[in-house]
Amino acid sequence: MAQIATNPLVLVDGSSYLYRAFHAFPSLTNAAGEPTSAMYGVLNMLKSLISQVQPTHIAVVFDAKGKTFRDEMFEQYKSHRPPMPDDLRKQIQPLHDMIRALGIPLLVVEGIEADDVIGTLALQASSLGKKVLISTGDKDMAQLVDDNIMLINTMNNSLLDRKGVIEKYGIPPELIIDYLALMGDSADNIPGVAGVGEKTALGLLQGIGSMAEIYANLEKVAELPIRGAKKLGEKLLAEKNNADLSYTLATIKTDVELNVTTDQLLLGESQKDQLIEYFARYEFKRWLNEVMNGADSITQTTEQPVKMNQYKATSQDQSAVENTPKIQIDRTKYETLLTQADLTRWIEKLNAAKLIAVDTETDSLDYMSANLVGISFALENGEAAYLPLQLDYLDAPKTLEKSTALAAIKPILENPNIHKIGQNIKFDESIFARHGIELQGVEFDTMLLSYTLNSTGRHNMDDLAKRYLGHETIAFESLAGKGKSQLTFNQIPLEQATEYAAEDADVTMKLQQALWLKLQEEPTLVELYKTMELPLLHVLSRMERTGVLIDSDALFMQSNEIASRLTALEKQAYALAGQPFNLASTKQLQEILFDKLELPVLQKTPKGAPSTNEEVLEELSYSHELPKILVKHRGLSKLKSTYTDKLPQMVNSQTGRVHTSYHQAVTATGRLSSSDPNLQNIPIRNEEGRHIRQAFIAREGYSIVAADYSQIELRIMAHLSGDQGLINAFSQGKDIHRSTAAEIFGVSLDEVTSEQRRNAKAINFGLIYGMSAFGLSRQLGISRADAQKYMDLYFQRYPSVQQFMTDIREKAKAQGYVETLFGRRLYLPDINSSNAMRRKGAERVAINAPMQGTAADIIKRAMIKLDEVIRHDPDIEMIMQVHDELVFEVRSEKVAFFREQIKQHMEAAAELVVPLIVEVGVGQNWDEAH
C-alpha cells in the first residue's frame, strides 16, 4: 500500500478544491448574507492535509482568469462548462487572501492553467530527487506520477503511486495522456477519437502500446479482442487529426517559465491579525477561537478532516461540522464469540446493561430471503462483540450451533427492559422476526435520529460516523470486493468480519450518544421522534413482511398488450422520421430530431451533445408530433420493464407475495418512499396504471380495502392560511374545485362549466407546488397572460392564501427552515442564495413543504393508531401505503366493520379547522377498491 513520504513538497490543485468545496457545502452564508461554503471547504481541506502531511514546502495553485494556449488551439476547450456561479466568484479573492494569511504560498500564473504550473514544479522537484505529493481529484494528473511523485485524493484520502495508477486505470502513468487522447475527456471537452470509449482505449493501449505505436501498427488493431475491432483501424485513421489534437490538449506542460523555485515554497507563519479579521467576518467560529487562543500555526488545529463527497452541509450544520469531536474507536475491545463460555459471559454483560446496540449481518439485503449469519453487540463502555452464526470458507473456525446460539440470545432481544439501539433497525427487526425472535425494547434508531434532526442530509452509518464522530468506518467493499465476485458476509475471514461487525455496533452506540444529545436541544423534535418516527418503524416492518398478493397471469397479459402498443408506436415514429431507427438509442434520436428534422436544441448533456431527456421531449412535443410519440413510448417501456415484466419475478417463493421496502429517511418532506417495487410510481390516472393496480389482489375469502385522504393538502392549506373562503367551502362539504371556479369566474356553482372546474383544479393544486403563470399556461394550454389573470383572480378571492405564501417565504428566509404542523423541519440552504434560480426553487419548496410534510405526518399518525387497533386481529392486515392512501386486506365478511374503523381513525389523525375526509373503497383488487 502506498504511503506518504516524509516531508514531501505538497502541490495543491486549488481550482479542483474550489469546485469540490462549493458543491459539497451549498449556500452557506454568514449573517450578512455573504456566501462562505467554498472558502470554508477549501480551508478545511487544506488544514486537514497539512495536519496530516506536516510539510515544510507547499503551494496552492489556482487557474488564472482568461484564455490559455489550449483555448487558442481548440476553441471548444472547456467551452461546455457553465459560467462560474456568482456565489462562487465572490469567494475567490477572500479565499486567496486567507490562504496567504495562513502562510501558505499561493500561485496564479496568467495565461497558464494550474495543472501546467503543478506539472512544472513537480518535475522540477522530482528531477532533484525530491518527493512530491500532488493533492487533486483530476485523473489527468496521473500522467505526472513517477518514482518521486504521488497523488492524494482528498475526497477519499486515497494515494496513487505508479502501482496505484496501474491498478486504478489498467495502464502505467506514461500512457495516461494516450488514454485521454483516445477516449477524450468530457470534463475538459477534449474530443478524443469518435467511437472510442474507455474500454476500447484500454484495449488498444494494453494490446499494442502507446498512441504512436498504435498508429504505426494500425493493421494489428483488427486482431485485438475488442468490440468492433475490424473497423476500428479505419476509424482511427480517419480521426488521426482529432487524436493528435487531443494528445496535445491532454498533455500537462512541465516546462512553464516560473519566477519561483520549489525551494522558495516554504510554509510560513500565519498572519494572526488578518486571520482574526477574516474568520470573524465569515463566522468560522472554531478557527477564530483557535487563533484567539494562541494557535499561530496552521498545523495547530483541532479541526477534523471533512470528506467533501460524503456530506452536503446545510447552514445549520456548519458549526456542527466545525466542532466535530474525534471519537476514539478502540478495536482491541472487540471480541469474537465462538464458544459457549464466551457467549454466556456476554449474555451476563448484556443482561446487566440498560442500553445495548444490536446489528445483524446477513448474506443479502433482501429482508425476506436473507440468511442471518451473525449478530454484533456493543455496550456503552466501548466493548463490542461479534457472534458468528455461519462461516463458509476453507478452514473456517467452527461456530456455535445456530439454533442454540439464537435460543440463548433470544430472551435478551425480546426483553423490553433492555433498551436497544440500531442503525436502520427495521431491517434487523424483520430478520429477527423471520428467525422466530420478536425484537422488543427498541429505543433508538440512529438513522431516524439523524433524519429527525435534519431530513435533508445523508443518514447512512458511514456518513453519520464521519459527520458526528470524525471516524472513518471500515468499508464493506474493502473486505468483500465489488461486482459479481463480491463475497457475502459469511465468506469473509472471521478476524476481519469481527472488526467490521463489532465496529458497526460500537459506532451505532456512539452515534446514539451524539445524536440524542443534539435532539434533546429541540423538545418538539424529540416528541416527533418518540411519537411518530420510532413507533412507525415497527408498523412498516410488519407491513413489509405481510406483503401483497399479485396476479402474475394478468401482468403477463398486460405485458403482451404493452408490447403490441410499443410496436405500433415504433411504426408511427418511423413514419414521422421517414426511416426506421432505434427509439432507445440516444445517438440515433439526436440525429433524427436535431440533424434531420432540425428541431431546436434546448439542452445539452455534460459532454456537449443535444439532450433528449423527457423534459426536452415534452417541450419539443408542442412543435412536432414525433417527440410526443417518443414520450409515450418511453412511458410504456418503463411500465413494462419496471412493473408488468418485473413484478412476477419479485414474488417471494415462500410467501407467494411481493414485499416492498419502505424508506423512512429518504424524502426531505417526511413522506415515505418505497422500492422493489416502487409503489409510489405506479401511474394513478391512466389506463395502464389501472391495469397494473388490477393485478394487486386479495387472497380467497378476503377483499382489498383502500382508504384515501380527500384533497388533504388543500385542506391543510386552508388550516395553515386561515383563509375563510377555503374554510367555508370545505366546512360546507362543497366541491372545492367547483367552488373555486365559481369564485374566480364570478358565476354560481350550477353555472360552472367542466372547463372552468378543470382550470380551477389546476390552480388549486398548482399553487400548492409553487407553479408559475408560465407553468399554469402550459398545463392548461392557454396564454401566459390568461394564466396570470386566473392566478390574480384566485388571490383576490382567497387573499389569506397569498398572505400565507408571503409570510412562509419570509419566515424561511429568517430562520432557514420551514415546519410542518407537528414540528418537523425542512432546512432550505438556498433560501437566501444570490442565485435567483436556486432561491426561487427554495421558495417554492418553502410553500409546499409545510403542506406535503403535514400530510405525511398525518398519514403516519393514522398508520400508528390503526396498527394498534388491528395488529393482533387475523381478519385484517395493513398491506400498502401509497401517497395519501392506505390499503388493507380484510376478511370479506368483516369489511363493513373495518371500513368504518379505518375511516374513523384516519379522519381523527389530526384536528384541523376543516374536516379531514377519507374515501374508502372495496374490491377484489386494488383498482376495484377505488
Swiss-Prot record:
Organism: Haemophilus influenzae (strain ATCC 51907 / DSM 11121 / KW20 / Rd)
Span of the signal peptide: none
Family: Belongs to the DNA polymerase type-A family.
Record-annotated 3'-5' exonuclease domain positions: 328-520
One Pfam family, short name: DNA_pol_A
Entry's Gene Ontology BP terms: DNA-templated DNA replication; double-strand break repair
InterPro entries according to UniProt: 3'-5'_exonuclease_dom (IPR002562), 5-3_exonucl_a-hlix_arch_N (IPR020046), 5-3_exonuclease (IPR002421), 5-3_exonuclease_C_sf (IPR036279), DNA-dir_DNA_pol_A_CS (IPR019760), DNA-dir_DNA_pol_A_palm_dom (IPR001098), DNA/RNA_pol_sf (IPR043502), DNA_polI_H3TH (IPR020045)
Any one GO MF annotation of this record: DNA-directed DNA polymerase activity
Catalytic activity field: DNA(n) + a 2'-deoxyribonucleoside 5'-triphosphate = DNA(n+1) + diphosphate
Protein's job: In addition to polymerase activity, this DNA polymerase exhibits 3'-5' and 5'-3' exonuclease activity.
Domain 5'-3' exonuclease as annotated: residue spans: 1-327
Assembly, per entry: Single-chain monomer with multiple functions.
Entry protein name: DNA polymerase I
Entries under PANTHER family matching the protein: DNA POLYMERASE I, DNA POLYMERASE NU
Enzyme Commission number(s) from the entry: 2.7.7.7
UniProtKB keywords: DNA damage, DNA repair, DNA replication, DNA-binding, DNA-directed DNA polymerase, Exonuclease, Hydrolase, Nuclease, Nucleotidyltransferase, Transferase
Keyword DNA damage in annotation: yes
Region (Polymerase) residue spans: 524-930
